[in-house]
Amino acid sequence: MARPEEGPELRLARLWWALGWALVVFITVSCLEPPRYVPNLHLWDKAEHALAFGGLALWFGGLVRRSRYLVVAFVMLLFGGGIEIAQGVMRLGRDMDIMDFLADGVGISIALTALYLGLGAWASWVERLIWPSREPS
């Protein structure tokens, strides 16, 4: 069991964090490169923002202790705001849009709710599926 001041005890913590940061890089590149290079998912743009930022918040929320969920949400909001500002100043065919930022916030809020309702242990659950406890029953 993890100590209260630490995140969940994860065997694959480095892998989970590395995959999370790969997702951050992917979302950053997808949001900042010219639109002609980005695949069209044929979803509503605001839904894409909510899914991307909510997914990131849920991902990283599963890697930290419960008391850090609000920090994860705040960092994700800063990330979303930074992306919108960068889109506005880069002039590569992207526009700064407050509605995209609000959609990011909706996704993050949904993820935060899911984390508090119990999905925050998702990484531990996956690891238990991969490596079941060898303790005698």
Where are these regions (language model features)?
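Bulky hydrophobic segments
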Residues: M1-F101, G105, S109-S137
